[in-house]
Design a protein with these regions (language model features):
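N-terminal Rossmann-like or analogous alpha/beta NTP/dinucleotide-binding catalytic cores
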Residues: 1-107, 203-216, 256
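Alpha-helix N-cap/helix-initiation motif
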Residues: 2-6, 33, 196-199, 246, ...
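Residue-level signal for inorganic ion chemistry
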Residues: 13, 44, 84, 88, ...
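Basic, alpha-helical terminal appendages of large translation-related enzymes
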Residues: 23-27, 38, 54-60, 67-68, ...
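Acidic, glycine-rich active-site loops and adjacent beta-strand->loop/helix elements
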Residues: 28-34, 198-199, 228, 304
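Active-site cores that bind ATP or allylic diphosphates and position pyrophosphate for catalysis
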Residues: 91-223, 228-235, 243, 401
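Catalytic adenosine-cofactor/nucleotide-binding cores of aminoacyl-tRNA synthetases and other
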Residues: 214-371, 380, 435-469
Length: 469
């Protein structure tokens, strides 16, 4: 699955590339074999394609600096790790470490390791390597002084070198660690902007020292603060927070999700400061990394629902029907009901597609309901006047020749005038009688037009019977 935070990182990277007329490169980082998840690469391709985040170079489209799968670049990483040993920025380590000791530190974790191999003369170390002795290659971090790095969001950050650990760059199986592979590949692939989560801030000083040891130009770092479930907790699939796939499955529109995710921790400036709705193309024109916030962003599902509802309203009737039809087909099985008419009715009030079955469940079958629904303070209806209204409505609708929303409304407004009551005293009881619900996707006459004359009259008679008990 694609975590919302990962989608945001991909989106920001794509926007930076498009804004500056650069190249967006898709690289598969699979050097930490223990963390590989089957099918994860397919999810990346599928999600990026769905979201319109097209890449200029990558494993599937090729490019001038491939291969774009890191595990296929093993020899290249070995070459640069050994080159770094020659330059004094790294050393061979022959300590008998367990796999756990050699494993990569989690983002933000410092794994202290003081190694005697650091002082081995290079020629002696090379002889031991040639003799077949197992080894890893570690970064040689200075014991004294400080390292300062610049981040586009967080500014300059200075770290004491004594707090940094001589991290493993090349593991005993010949594969690089994540940190080393990314520095080498970012340089070789000409990466100018590195966008990642703020949990990698603690690794940035070590990256800087690697760039300096090689004599390479340091790219622009853009560290994004985490996406939070609330003020205290990060979003986590383990705790039931939705992934991109979950949101789409629930019936959110990709365009709405992207729009919302873009604004999770980034704010437009100037004339767009108050604006909330953007297409991907519009974002690409105005996206500026100076708008990325240092503060964590809270994922507000209610705000996303609201935004999605606005996107639903903007869809053409045809486009909405295309999205809603699979859901409506399973929710409304009566062949006499026009699904396009149902879609037209629900579209203005639809927040997410997965809400639709509950919104239209009364169409196939009138649910059992309490007569208390007829009592409505605002509509000024009681059990008594609701019964009177339905009894007056029945003969009027029985005699109606043309069964359309307009004709129904006209006839019922005329009835209310004749009875000398507010329109709502007639319309609210009718709405309850034909739907059995307090909340419906349309008004009373719209529901009657949808259900047809025979079904509507049968439900009105049921309402009269219930209120007469």
């Amino acid at each position: 699955y694609m975590h919302v935070g990962n989608l945001r990182t991909a989106l920001y990277t794509w926007l930076i590339a498009r804004r500056h007329h650069g190249k967006f490169i898709l690289r598969i980082e699979d050097t930490d074999q223990g963390r590989l998840v089957e099918g994860a690469v397919d999810v990346i391709y599928k999600t990026m394609a769905e979201c319109g985040l097209d890449h200029d170079e990558g494993p599937d489209v090729g490019g001038p600096v491939g291969p774009y799968i890191q595990s296929e670049r093993r020899e290249l990483f070995g070459k640069y790790a050994k080159l770094l040993c020659e330059k004094g920025g790294a050393y061979y380590c022959f300590c008998q470490k367990s796999d756990e000791d050699e494993s990569e530190a989690a983002p933000g974790e410092i794994k202290k390791h003081v190694c005697a191999c650091r002082d081995l003369p290079l020629e002696e170390a090379k002889k031991r390597v040639e003799a077949g002795e197992p080894f890893v290659i570690r970064q040689r971090i200075p014991h004294e002084g400080t390292t300062t790095f610049h981040d586009a969001s967080f500014g300059d950050i200075t770290v004491e070198n004594k707090e940094l650990e001589d991290q493993v760059l090349l593991k005993s199986d010949g594969l690089p660690t994540y940190n080393f592979a990314n520095v080498v590949d970012d340089h070789l692939m000409g990466i100018t902007h590195v966008v990642r989560g703020s949990e990698y801030l603690s690794s940035a000083p070590k990256y800087n020292l690697l760039y300096e040891a090689f004599g390479w130009e340091i790219p622009t770092y853009v560290h994004c603060s985490p996406v939070m479930r609330d003020a205290q907790h990060k979003m986590s699939k383990r705790h039931g927070d939705p992934s991109y796939e979950d949101l789409i499955r629930e019936g959110y529109l990709t365009e709405a999700v992207l729009n919302y995710v873009a604004l999770l921790g980034w704010s437009p400036k100037g004339e767009n400061a108050e604006r909330e709705f953007y297409t991907l193309a519009e974002l690409a024109e105005i996206f500026d990394i100076s708008g990325i916030s240092k503060s964590p962003a809270v994922f507000d599902i209610n705000k996303l629902r609201w935004m999605n509802a606005e996107y639903m309203k903007k869809l053409s009737p045809e486009a909405f029907f295309a999205k809603a039809e699979p859901v409506l087909k399973t929710a409304v099985t009566n062949p006499a009901v026009d699904l396009r008419a149902v879609a037209a009715l629900v579209q203005p009030r639809c927040e997410i597609l997965s809400d639709l079955p509950e919104r239209v469940d009364f169409i196939d079958k009138l649910p059992e309901y309490s007569t208390e629904l007829y009592v409505h303070k605002k509509s000024k209806t009681t059990l008594e006047n609701s019964l009177s209204s339905l009894q007056a409505i029945l003969p009027v609708l029985e005699g109606l020749q043309t069964w359309t929303n307009e004709n129904l409304y006209e006839a019922l407004v005329a009835l209310a005038a004749k009875l000398e009551v507010k329109n709502s005293v007639v319309l609210w009881p009718l709405r309850v009688a034909v739907s059995g619900k307090a909340s419906t996707p349309g008004g009373a006459t719209e529901l009657c037009a949808l259900l047809g004359k025979e079904e509507s009259l049968a439900r009105i008679r049921t309402g009269i019977e219930l209120l007469s008990r």
